[in-house]
Amino acid sequence: MQIKINSLITPFIDTTPRFSWSLPEGNFASQKAYMLTVATDKAFENTVFSTRAETAERANVRCDIALLPHTKYFVRICAELCGGETVTGETYFCTGFMGGEWDAKYITGGDAKKRDAVLPAVYLRREFAAKKPRRAVLYVVGLGYFEAHINGEKVGDDFLSTPFTAYDKNILYRAFDVTEMLAEGENAIGVILGNGFYNCFTEDPWQTNTAPWRDVPKLMLELHMEYEHGTEKLLSDGTWSYVEGPIRFNGIRHGEEYDANFEKEGWDKPGYTGEEKPARYVRNPGARLSLMEMEPIRVIAKYKPVLCRKTENGYLYELAQNIAGVANITFCGKAGARYTVRYTDRLMEDGEPDHESLACFIRNYCFQTDVYTKKSDAPESFHSIFTYHGFQYIEVTGGDCPELCDIEAWALCNDFEKRAEFACSDETVNKIEHLCHASTVSCCMHTLSADAVREKSSWTGDTGLSAEQLLINYNAENLMRKWQQDLRDSMRPGGCMPCIVPSAGWGYSGDLNGPDWCNPMVDVPWNLYTEYGDLAVLRDNYEALCAHVSYITSMSQGYIAEYGLGDWCAPFDGPAISVNMSAYKCPLAVSDTAFYHSAVKMAEKYARLLGFCADAEKYAALASKVKAAFREKFFDAENCTVYGDCQSATAMMVYHGLANEEEIPQLVETLARIIERDGYHPDFGILGCKAVVETLGRYGRADLVLKMLTNPTYPSMKVWLDMGATTLFECWNGGGSRNQHMFSSVSAFFHKYVAGLSAAAPGYRELEFRPALYTELTYASASVNTPYGKAACGFEKQNGKTTVYLTVPADCTGKLYIGETVREFTAGEYAVEV
């Protein structure tokens, strides 16, 4: 039995614990009851909570336990199965401050009065004597990023701690069990601070350098050492010191400059005798402090270059895969040699690396560039720690070119588990699925950023459109819960949201934050509820959703909304600039009003589930008015066409619930005719992409989607593959970013409507099987590790026979839809000939 608390293994938590557990794979016996016990000792002699419940529930089970701060709790769960068998598991979790006060103070090193972009990274240190503790926990607030060391060893194996938030509203602190890192007697702790997004000095269109939270990097730290009798704390305060270190420059959108001549041997160990200066107290940011309950960023894959060649300025190393991360490079030159390492994901027509196309928004300092200066003639290794880059190509200039074997690229991502698989008989479709995955993991760096190169910011529309496939494919529940808090923190009291979140203050005005780009407040909580079955996510976001609906209503005229970004990045000719990327066919009022209607209908759905009956009736009435206004203004009922006469507009009427049930078959036929007229090419941008593939998949025309995506001529995703894509592109013509996830909603389509597997009830307690047997595919399969176990659906055509393969987890049911026939299944594995 695997037990998770708040969807994590043995976590530190600050919130009400949610318990989830799995039964052994292949055991389809129903759970009759469970016994859950929580104690403060491993022998379960000091029990603080115990309950037995006769239920099959085992996902996000909330228990009202009076938890103490800074405490380790042991958990035992015994699941009683209907056949008489019992399955037992044990685990533990630890609490942080639980909202309590910190005794430590914020400190920094260097000139604490200046927000100077070229200040080196801050190296803080403290030596102390201690007995060997029974348990030791290190709590760190490190702004913007930090890396902690104890006795010369790095604490943890993650990168880019602390997560990006609106630092004036919410700061996420970290907790580490460091018991084994402390020695009896003399010890030392060192912390390196980088700028991150907290002290982001980039002059860019998004006002990052004028963020209301911006300040010098700072540290607040408490080390709690627990002994047999009593505890001891080490706090960040005026007794700390700082040293000058080798990271001379660091910027999240720029890179890192490292001069090994400034290394201070032993600075993070006891007995250091080099020069030190007193640390300084600095201003408390004043935000609430929350424990990071989320998978950290780690190295998830490593790649060696597949090619090395000479360029005009140096040597270029090519990877087989476009990634986001860092390069670990060993330099073999002479002492004093200075190397410049530049990263890009594209080449110019002459084969030289293109370092400028995506640097257009960065108006100061370098872009995607690291610099390393050697201190000796011996080999020296380096990787940046306070930035990451998006790249497939690494250009090294200066000194002696490092050998090919001396470069290794490390892909970084929040280290959540992959929970789903998809494959089919069309290798082009499989490659498109890979593009979706590769782009998604490249952009998961504590938020789902729009891209890994140009901006590293989370555009709300992009994230909202990708969230469903992200949550299907990965256990990214905590990442999206965190981002929902970011959304709530960014919302103004009247319901206005920015189009990038977290935002430094940009994106609240103009035609940037319409119902389309603010839709994540509507859909993402529902995606979380669908995938993981926790009603609390709807409750947490309900007030904000209501405010958002009120704001859209205030911006509408006669229940028609028209103030968003629209169907961004539909096919266009020319460079990837805003005037081209916004040249879409779908009228803005059509898409915005469709999203307005969805927001109101979802508010009604939330209200009914949460028991707010009066609200539900209010939103039902408002939805009827929006629907009536849309139909009157945009729908030609006689010809069954939608204003705009394009794929996106037609699909949106169906997808957003603006069509009556009896009209849907004819609208799907209209959509099919438009696609045929367009030569089986997509004419949609990212809004239309999701609406079109969902509509066609739901109503039995997945074949048209596959034909469009795999069309050998422009525009299509097949053309991206022919252009060498290993990640999704931003624009159909290959312009803009070469690693952007915003078209990745097609992955959810593959799972739900090609292989045919989707959740019909929260947490997959009910499953829906809709395999696309009518396509030319000879097989397709999908599986997902649901909260109740593995679910799967697939089909195989062989020797004139078609067999559908199903897996229904214990305590779940499923319905198989083949044409007009519906068959029901209980838990088990099935092979059904159709």
Give the positions of each predicted feature.
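Non-transmembrane amphipathic alpha-helical segments
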Residues: 525, 597-600, 604
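C-terminal capping/lid segments that line or modulate ligand- or cofactor-binding pockets
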Residues: 189, 259-263, 455, 473, ...
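Active-site acid/base region of carbohydrate-active enzymes
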Residues: 145, 235-244, 403-435, 441, ...
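Non-catalytic C-terminal accessory modules of carbohydrate-active enzymes
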Residues: 213-222, 232-267, 290-294, 298-301, ...
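Active/binding-pocket-proximal capping segment
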Residues: 146, 155-157, 162, 487, ...
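Extracellular/oxidizing-compartment recognition motifs
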Residues: 1-72, 76-454, 462, 478-481, ...
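Alpha-helical support elements that line or immediately flank enzyme active sites
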Residues: 136-140, 150, 326-345, 383-386, ...
